[in-house]
Amino acid sequence: IGPDPDDMEKFSDKAALKEIMSKAGLAVIPGTGALSSAGEAKEAALQAGYPVMLKASAGGGGRGIRLIGSEEELEEAYMQAAGEAQSAFGDGSLYIEKYIYPARHIELQMLADEYGNVVCLGERDCSLQRRNQKLLEETPSPAVSPVQRKALISASTAALKKTGYSGAGTLEFLMDKEGNFWFMEMNVRLQVEHCVTEMLTGIDMVKWQIRIAAGVPLDFGQEDIHLSGSAIECRINARGCGELQMLHVPGGPSVRFDTCLIDGTVVSPYYDPLLGKLVVYSGAREEAIRKIRASLCELVIDGIPTNIEEQLRIVEDDRFTSGSYDLTFMDNR
């Protein structure tokens, strides 16, 4: 279940994928292909102009990424990022992108079948991150206007259709302060944050991933996707090791907690710290914010240190409630 293996290989090289998407009509962040050495990286960075982003070609989850402010920083950062990428992905190749600042991380959830049908299930705002790892997602983004949304969805569905891709996938963009969208990468899988899109649209994406793999065509089109209301997801992460003594999950309409936790679950330091995803939906963003605050207060995970209190502080922050946050949010706390 999932995309064709050839597509997975083709789309996994982020540097090469940018060229594919540029030819398909999307604006891509200026940058390089895969680099062969730190010396080549220095030449590319000088040409692009500092600051630049150094990224793993096969990367994901915030690994193998460095912000480089000057030539003096580059060589050591190159070796560190290459080693990190090799360890995490089995591929140490890197590429350089122009650093866009300030920016928001906006991604589009796509479904495409083998018959050429492509549908976008709206955007997610994933700008609340620490060390390039997402903490909270919401849909729709408070920063994207209806006119921008319509244009972005139209361009993205047309571009993905040209590639012949089939399956669930996510197109990731940076939105600059002028409101331009710059393509970064594509994830050829169902992402952690797909739940928030399911809550907004009512579409079971796991079911459709299975149906697409079985050769079933999409039975809905773009005109059937209604992006009304607001959904917010908080990632609940472990902050240390422990054994779960008690779990209390918040209830109520349009409240969802996806987790594998049960009493007695032991959390070790050897795996991803994600414990669960708390997701809420409401007809208005203001009400969704009130609902996620109440749900965070009600959620109890006893015996394991978590980031619940931190998530509560985030959703109570004026920059979040006003919708004016960007990728620097956690740096300025």
Where are these regions (language model features)?
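Conserved beta-strand edge residues that scaffold enzyme active sites
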Residues: 7, 34-35, 59, 174
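Short acidic loop-to-helix transition motifs that present clustered carboxylates
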Residues: 34-40, 101-103
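A short, GP-enriched loop/loop-strand-helix hinge that lies immediately N-terminal to
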Residues: 1-12, 27-33
